[in-house]
UniProtKB/Swiss-Prot annotation:
GO terms for biological process: glucose metabolic process; glycolytic process. In response to oxidative stress, the active site Cys likely reacts with bacillithiol (BSH) to form mixed disulfides to protect the Cys residue against overoxidation. S-bacillithiolation presumably leads to loss of catalytic activity. Debacillithiolation by monothiol bacilliredoxin BrxC restores the activity. This is Glyceraldehyde-3-phosphate dehydrogenase 1. NCBIfam families: GAPDH-I (TIGR01534). The keyword Cell inner membrane does not apply. Transmembrane segments: none annotated. It is an enzyme of class 1 (oxidoreductase). D-glyceraldehyde 3-phosphate binds at residues 151-153, 182, 197, 210-211, 233. The gene is gapA.
Amino acid sequence: MAVKVGINGFGRIGRNVFRAALNNPEVEVVAVNDLTDANMLAHLLQYDSVHGKLDAEVSVDGNNLVVNGKTIEVSAERDPAKLSWGKQGVEIVVESTGFFTKRADAAKHLEAGAKKVIISAPANEEDITIVMGVNEDKYDAANHDVISNASCTTNCLAPFAKVLNDKFGIKRGMMTTVHSYTNDQQILDLPHKDYRRARAAAENIIPTSTGAAKAVSLVLPELKGKLNGGAMRVPTPNVSLVDLVAELNQEVTAEEVNAALKEAAEGDLKGILGYSEEPLVSGDYNGNKNSSTIDALSTMVMEGSMVKVISWYDNESGYSNRVVDLAAYIAKKGL
């Protein structure tokens, strides 16, 4: 039986989680909470400028969504503790508003009747941060109720950093994410707490910060203090890449690095880590469900132990598919 999921926040990630769940028989979205009315939610679910029209029948019945004949209850409650997850049969809540990333705030969903909460972002004081393919085996149903799915960038970096570290050992590394713009930026110049993110997103390359590299240590403790980096926000609406330059503990060739990454992509990390030897560009990865896809043509080695690896990720679709995978995994291991 599919685990019943509620989504709090029906924005870019919330709607993409819904889309991903439609293709996963182990997960069923039964309720959505968002401060927008059902007609607008239905419209934005059905028509997407990045991912295209949803291949499903979408309509509205009163205040609820109806997708492929199934009713999804819609509410518009600001306080998570006042939601009706228990009455609605919701077992896992996907917290995707971007506002409730502290454990104490996200835990209000538990007060409302949910059994577990997945925060679709880096969190504060969460019970555990999980990156699928890297550390999901650490999940403990008895002690982990509020779980962070980390960031889309950490989901891209961690799987191939794990391969490099397991195979060759990482001494230190610096990463840059070349990241599509998001709703945390301005379309035209407007005030923002980050002076650079205040500038027009579709007109500029914007240097900014990311905690993704340091956050890798949350799922790979052996890399604590060994990775750091930053971000460049670029004028594309979706698909990003991670550029990692790392010093390894042993000398390697580019061929050896690619061989290790390809082996992992075809083995233990299949469906999480992809591997491509084609000369592709960002648009080719729109809709890609992997967390990370190695651009093998870009792998470089200098002086034996310094390696450069580039990996692509659909920062919306790939990440949202991992949220759904995590929900299914939690349901299997115990609520």
